[in-house]
Regions:
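Catalytic active-site module of serine/aspartate enzymes centered on a nucleophile-bearing elbow/loop
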Residues: 3-11, 304-348
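An N-terminal hydrophobic leader/cap segment in hydrolases
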Residues: 11-70
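Active-site loop/oxyanion-hole signature of alpha/beta-hydrolase fold enzymes
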Residues: 59-60, 66-74, 80-82, 114, ...
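Conserved HGGG/HGGXW glycine-rich cap/lid loop of the alpha/beta-hydrolase fold
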Residues: 73-129
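Flexible "cap/lid" loop of the alpha/beta hydrolase fold
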Residues: 171-176, 180-215
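Conserved alpha/beta-hydrolase catalytic His-Asp/Glu region
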Residues: 196-202, 213-276
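Short alpha-helix in the alpha/beta-hydrolase fold that links the catalytic acid
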Residues: 268-270, 292-301
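Short beta-strand/loop motif that positions the catalytic acidic residue
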Residues: 276, 282-284, 288
Length: 348
């Protein structure tokens, strides 16, 4: 039977408590190991010269190309960018989308440059000629990448144009770094406010961590390389397949972007944009089956001052299929004498 003597209980406490305290002190008073830099995976730049990618999308696809090492924690990420157009031109940033790198602007960027704009293009982390850090591809990762790149090229601000997921990046960038936006933001076939139900079951399955683990295994990668080298689809489809087959972290980067990135949940960014003096343009095709046309109207509901240019029968790749229409709309919008017109424009 336990003693009811209070002095006995005190003596036991005096023996046990210091021991417990010392144990806890040594267990919890030490810091964990120093943070480990993320693993960095290579880009198209490391493929052999025999790879078809060098013919489709070489490093010098645009003039004025260069690399920069951008900081990410304790790591440095190699990023490819291009500056085209006159050095004293009005500055425009073009942000590509989820899977296709800066080649997607091939029929738009030169038009802007020829009309006197200084255009900055770049490959997002994990795409094209930019390395792929093994991290979560969330919105902050992409907005910070652009802010660091603009700092590197010594741009105080610029007009911001985003395509597809790049539209989500443009919206979040405007919210995170409003001082870097020079009064104009354009969204082309823009994502950013899609809901989980708007993403196909197949896309959700393929972007799951389990599937990504399987597809990273050497046998699957070998199969994808053979498939990519044997097939000759359209230009953009081929660069997509080559990235998927040859870049070790491309599929995981795309999957993480789909799960965690600027595809969904950016209503707040568009709402914040509505509270600024920025002029806003939305360009969207009625036949877009990737980011449905309804999202153009939903974005406009969030940003009432936005102009909406509707491209009749335009799909998701309108910078390729309707490049002249997109270029014309952007040139009108970026001009100094642009003024908002309440009635939407429709391009047949």
């Amino acid at each position: 039977m336990m003693s009811s003597n209070p002095f006995h209980r005190i003596n036991i406490s005096l023996v046990i408590l210091p021991s417990l305290f010392l144990t806890a002190y040594y267990l919890f008073a030490s810091f964990p190991r120093s943070p480990i830099p993320p693993i960095i995976h290579t880009s198209l730049a490391h493929l052999p010269s025999s790879s078809p990618s060098w013919n489709i999308y070489p490093e010098n696809f645009y003039n004025g190309g260069a690399y920069v090492n951008l900081p990410l924690g304790r790591a440095r990420i190699l990023v490819r960018y291009w500056l085209i157009g006159p050095e004293n031109g009005r500055r425009v940033v073009l942000i590509h989308g989820l899977s296709i790198p800066a080649i997607v602007w091939k029929d738009v960027a030169p038009v802007l440059a020829s009309r006197g704009y200084r255009v900055l293009l770049y490959d997002l982390y994990g795409r094209g000629y930019s390395d792929a850090p093994q991290v979560t591809y969330d919105t902050t990762l992409f907005t910070t990448q652009l802010a660091l790149l603009m700092q590197h090229v010594k741009w105080d601000n610029a007009f911001i144009v985003g395509l597809s997921m790049g539209g989500g990046i443009a919206a979040a960038f405007s919210a995170h770094f409003p001082h870097l936006v020079n009064g104009k933001v354009a969204f082309v076939a823009s994502a950013g406010i899609m809901e989980s139900g708007d993403i196909s079951r197949t896309a959700k399955f393929m972007s799951s961590p389990l599937v990504q683990t399987v597809t990273a295994l050497p046998p699957f990668q070998h199969y994808m390389r053979r498939l990519a080298n044997a097939s000759k689809p359209a230009e953009l489809q081929e660069i997509l397949r080559l990235q998927s087959a040859h870049l070790p972290h491309y599929n995981a980067a795309v999957a993480s972007s789909l799960r965690d990135g600027p595809i969904r949940g950016l209503h707040f960014a568009f709402q914040e944009l509505a509270c600024t003096s920025n002029q806003v343009l939305i360009i969207h095709g009625t036949a877009d089956d990737t980011v449905l046309y309804k999202f153009a109207s939903k974005i406009r509901d969030l940003v009432p001052q936005a102009d909406l240019v509707t491209i009749s029968d335009g799909g998701h790749d309108i910078t390729i299929t309707h490049a002249s229409d997109v270029s014309a709309a952007l040139l009108r919008f970026l001009a100094d004498n642009y003024s908002y017109k309440p009635a939407q424009m429709s391009l047949a």
